[in-house]
Amino acid sequence: MESFLRIKSLERSDIPIIIEWARNEGFAPGRGDFEIYRNTDRQGMWMGWIGSSPVGCISAIRYNEEYGFVGLYLVAEKWRGQGYGRALWNKAIDHLSGLPCIGLEAAESMRAVYQRHGFQPSSTTTRWQLISDGSTRKPRTSLKGFNLVPGSGISEAEVQMYDAHREPSPRPHFLHLWLTHKAGSVFALADQAGKCHGFGRIRPSLLRKGEGWRIGPLMADTPEGASHLLSGLIAKHEGVIWIDSPGLNQQADQILEDSGFSPIGKTIRMYKGLPPSGSIDEVYGLACLELG
C-alpha cells in the first residue's frame, strides 16, 4: 500500500470532499464558498493524497506582497497524528514566505501550536447564532438619508471601494466572486448619490445536520447602519443564522445582542509579523474565517 503523501493543487472535483469534511467539523460551509476560495488563488489551495485516498487540505491565500492568510486546514480523522498535517502546513507557509504579515483564525486548542510557529494572538472572534422565524426585525433607531438597496441597486465599484478601506488588504477578485455568486443575497446602504455606506451578504450554509444561513461580511459607517443592514439580511430567512464578529469592534456585540443573536463559540485571530494597522470599527461581521 502506498504511504507517500502527495500534495497537489486543489481540483474542482476535490471540492465535495472538503465540503463534507468542513461540514462534519461544524464549520458550516456556505454554498459556493470553496469554489470562490479556489478561484481567488488557484496556486494557494492544496489536497494531500495517499494513493487514491484524500488525507487533508489547506489554503494559503496570497492577497498581495504585503498580506496572506492561512485557512481551511483539515486532516481527515483516520489520517491524523501521522505527520501529514505538518506537511500540508509547511506547503502553505512556504507559499506565503517573504510576506510581512500572515494571518489565520485559530481554535483555542491550537493557540500554543501556532505560537510555536511565530503567530501571536490579536483578538477574539465570536460566532453568534439566531434562530430566525423569517420576520423583519425593526432596528431601534431610524436611519435618515440612506436607502437599504439590494446588491443590484448599487454599483460594484462603490462596494469594492468601501470594502478596500476596511480590510487589511484589498480583495477585488474575491469580493467580485463573493458579491455575484447566485447562492447569496447582498444588501447595501446607499445615499441619494448612490455612494456606499455599508453592505452585507447572507448565504445558505451546510450545518452538521440540515442547512442554515451565514451572514458575512457586514460593514457599515455606524452601528445604526449595521443594525439596519442586519435587519434586511435576516428578513425572510428562516432557521439557524450564524455570523462571526471581530473582537476589535466592541460595538458589534451589542448590535448582535439587540438583534436576538447569542454567542455560541470563539476563535482567535492570530498574526505572524506586523499586524494590520487599519481600524475595523466599521466591520461587524467577517466574510469567512477561511480567507480572513
Where are these regions (language model features)?
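Ligand-binding pocket scaffold of soluble enzyme catalytic domains
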Residues: 7-10, 15, 21, 26, ...
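Flexible loop/N-cap segments at domain edges
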Residues: 189, 194-203, 207-245
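Active-site/acyl-donor-binding loops of N-acyltransferases
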Residues: 106, 117-137, 203, 217-219, ...
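Conserved beta-strand in the GNAT
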Residues: 47, 52-61, 68-74, 194-208, ...
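Amide-forming acyltransferase catalytic core, primarily the GNAT-like/NAT-type
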Residues: 16, 119-214
